[in-house]
Amino acid sequence: LMVVTSNADRICTGITSSNSPHVVKTATQGEVNVTGVIPLTTTPTKSHFANLKGTKTRGKLCPKCLNCTDLDVAFGRPKCMGTIPSAKASILHEVKPVTSGCFPIMHDRTKIRQLPNLLRGYENIRLSTHNVINAETAPGGPYIVGTSGSCPNVTNGNGFFATMAWAVPKNNNNKTATNPLTVEVPFICTEGEDQITVWGFHSDNEIQMVKLYGDSKPQKFTSSANGVTTHYVSQIGGFPKQAEDGGLPQSGRIVVDYMVQKSGKTGTITYQRGILLPQKVWCASGRSKVIKGSLPLIGEADCLHEKYGGLNKSKPYYTGEHAKAIGNCPIWVKTPLKLANGTKYRPPAKLLKERGFFGAIAGFLEGGWEGMIAGWHGYTSHGAHGVAVAADLKSTQEAINKITKNLNSLSELEVKNLQRLSGAMDELHNEILELDEKVDNLRADTISSQIELAVLLSNEGIINSEDEHLLALERKLKKMLGPSAVDIGNGCFETKHKCNQTCLDRIAAGTFNAGEFSLPTFDSLNITAASLNDDGLDNHTILLYYSTAASSLAVTLMIAIFIVYMVSRDNVSCSICL
């Protein structure tokens, strides 16, 4: 009895399928459905401003100076003297700083409103302990240092700003018109610091000008430092009486300006009557990032954004309104971005069938395989046991590593773009510290376009790498199966043994041993020999009987065939008689 058996199963490499496809954009394929995505963008909502995490954040210049504007602090108003804490970040909460108390100031004649913003741009700010000029003995003197009841000191006596000395001629002998006089302003700060020198001039109606200075004509003033020269001419009269912060009404006005002296550099001031000579100066160093915002600062945040307030960074990019931001901030992009985090979407696989020798089923994979929950790439087998699926964790991890690398590359691109294209935003200008919005928007558009292209290329690479992963799986599978299977193409192999779920799991884990699953091969014949009973006959006798019977049968058959042949040719006749 001979029994022929076939034990062929089919094993194929495959990719997972999903019932929830997502869409990503690629550079050349347009929109592609994938099994998973990593959202790269968020749209923030407006919140209160906060302290920047990991840094000291400055709100008011002098938090302990009560009832004082930042301009009061910058001028050194007597009741607004205090320490300005160091800070790496500052909130420009007075977009247009309000007027200072004390004496009425003509803010619009100079850039003095920018002084608080300039000071915010420094990390460390201190007021000098010594005066930069001896006002009493300055050219054109001797002078007395004027004070005003409109600017009371801490004891409520008459006072004036700590940064300026109101130089009033001491006696009638020098209360006369004078030609322009020049005083040198030395650098008294520490090396490496910037020196911010505040100065100004006073003007009033003709009567007061003659009374104070002996000259009723407009006076000329010039300041020069670091190659920047500024000219002013005073305005005589025409001012209505005005009181500041509850002070006494004043018919006169003061004009205040400042100059920035770099380390070791001197400045000059040329003046006539009514000069407000510089006294204590601001010594500043380091850089503090400045952003427009509002007070109070509540809690902490990763990022401070002019439009959204305090933000905690959850994604590398954001959509919505673009504006200046400081800290660990997401980068603005025009449209939402997603990075492929899986494989190209394939509908569940169909097994196409065709009849083969002995009714064997041949099929191949079309689409993706369901059930591969532990990974993206893996193996399938189908045969009498049905369909088994197993994920290859190593291949999946390699794919995940590539996506992680792409994500890290995008993060590096984010940092490089910030440093290269937005670096100028960190170096605040020495004066107004304002940005040209058109240039800033153009910079943001450029960064957004670069990031979007990088994401498209990353998605393209992730999707195209699937072929590499499948080819690697096919090589791995072929090596493990060895001679126990035949390569039939398309990543499929026909085995000479059964391969159920256990077999497939071992293949996926890399522990497969063909010997454990192999059965006799298809080309082996199973022959069952007939058993002979022993009747006391020896082998020779049995062989003799067998040979005689076989020979007699053969001779009889030959004679019968010969007779039939002769009769058919009429060479032999046969008569039957009864």
From Swiss-Prot:
A lipid is attached at residues 574, 577 (S-palmitoyl cysteine). Disulfide bonds join 12-492, 68-80, 102-151, 499-503. Glycans are attached at residues 33, 67, 153, 174, 312, 341, 500, 526, 539. Residues 1-546 are extracellular. Keywords: Disulfide bond, Fusion of virus membrane with host endosomal membrane, Fusion of virus membrane with host membrane, Glycoprotein, Hemagglutinin, Host cell membrane, Host membrane, Host-virus interaction, Lipoprotein, Membrane, Palmitate, Transmembrane, Transmembrane helix, Viral attachment to host cell, Viral envelope protein, Viral penetration into host cytoplasm, Virion, Virus endocytosis by host, Virus entry into host cell. Binds to sialic acid-containing receptors on the cell surface, bringing about the attachment of the virus particle to the cell. Plays a major role in the determination of host range restriction and virulence. Class I viral fusion protein. Responsible for penetration of the virus into the cell cytoplasm by mediating the fusion of the membrane of the endocytosed virus particle with the endosomal membrane. Low pH in endosomes induce an irreversible conformational change in HA2, releasing the fusion hydrophobic peptide. Several trimers are required to form a competent fusion pore. This is Hemagglutinin.
